[in-house]
């Protein structure tokens, strides 16, 4: 009987030890198993088997929330709904659409998190360790982007002085059925294609929530340089097993015959008031800022001067 009791204790311990040795020491799964061992339970092993929702596959964007922005695009000077601070507003006002013709920027990929709102399909694939079968990373690819790795093995983010890229450095973890992604080390880039930008100090958190064949992506940009408070957006995708991510070759050509870098000097952009004039809005309200995000700002708008609407139509 004593030998039977010892076998009941020793065998689970050996099994748990084998599992622990088969995964990297820094992995989330390994840490979960270790906590289960310390508590005298097998909870860690069960967590490894049940903590993830499968997000892999081909997805097509459903831009219901951003149909105007992703159609003809936001007008110059339209910063509605963006919590820009003074520095972010100044950066946006220097924007010149001619920069897209620069050879250095023609093949620039959409940055995180703007790439979620780009047109076309999106592919999520899994990188799995062939021995432990542990999920090492998700890889996300869009029509116009580089491969984006989202590391799931618990590795730390690099130091502040590490290189910044368009996709940054991303790590993920599951909270219930939601994949939560944290991204740092991003290059300065646009958050709306008419000028508003995030700085290279921005930190982006994303929540991927799957409901059957639909995937909701919520993005949260925290930028101490250009934003007064976090900028939050969401976008939807639909699972599409009968599609394939299309090939998108990018060839750089000399489109810009100008001898200058396209930009506007502070206070010298003549087109900034056109949006307010054409839509009958107070110019101050179109400048963005955290205050403009909330419903009670409507009462303040009633006290503002509105420029008479001009008949000129938007391009």
List the predicted regions and their residue ranges:
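Hydrophobic small-molecule pocket/channel-lining residues, especially in calycin-type beta-barrels
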Residues: 2-4, 23-315
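Bacterial N-terminal signal peptides
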Residues: 11-22
């Amino acid at each position: 009987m004593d030998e039977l009791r010892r076998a009941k204790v020793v065998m689970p311990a050996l099994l748990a030890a084998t599992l622990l040795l088969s995964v990297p020491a820094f992995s989330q799964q390994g840490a979960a198993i270790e906590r289960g061992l310390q508590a005298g339970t097998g909870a860690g092993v069960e967590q490894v088997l049940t903590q993830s929702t499968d997000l892999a596959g081909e997805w097509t964007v459903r831009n219901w929330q951003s149909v105007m922005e992703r159609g003809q695009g936001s007008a110059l000077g339209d910063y509605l709904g963006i919590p820009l601070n003074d520095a972010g507003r100044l950066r946006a006002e220097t924007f010149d659409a001619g920069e897209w013709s620069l050879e250095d920027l023609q093949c620039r990929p959409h940055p995180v998190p703007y790439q979620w709102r780009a047109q076309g399909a999106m592919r999520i694939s899994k990188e799995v360790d062939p021995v432990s079968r542990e999920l090492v990373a998700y890889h996300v690819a869009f029509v116009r982007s580089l491969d984006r790795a989202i590391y799931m093995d618990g590795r730390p983010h690099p130091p502040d002085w590490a290189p910044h890229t368009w996709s940054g450095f991303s790590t993920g973890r599951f909270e219930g059925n939601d994949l939560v992604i944290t991204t740092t080390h991003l290059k300065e880039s646009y958050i709306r294609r008419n000028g508003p930008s995030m700085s290279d100090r921005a930190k982006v958190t994303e929540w991927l929530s799957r409901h059957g064949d639909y995937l909701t992506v919520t993005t949260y940009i925290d930028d101490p340089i250009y934003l007064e408070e976090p900028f939050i957006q969401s976008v939807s995708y639909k699972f599409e097993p009968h599609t394939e991510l299309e090939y998108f070759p990018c060839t750089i050509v000399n489109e810009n015959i100008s001898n200058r870098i396209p930009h506007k000097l502070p206070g010298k952009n003549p087109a900034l008031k056109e949006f307010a004039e054409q839509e009958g809005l107070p110019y101050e309200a179109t400048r963005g800022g955290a205050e403009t995000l909330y419903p009670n700002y409507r009462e303040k708008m009633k006290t503002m001067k509105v420029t008479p609407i001009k008949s000129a139509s938007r391009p």
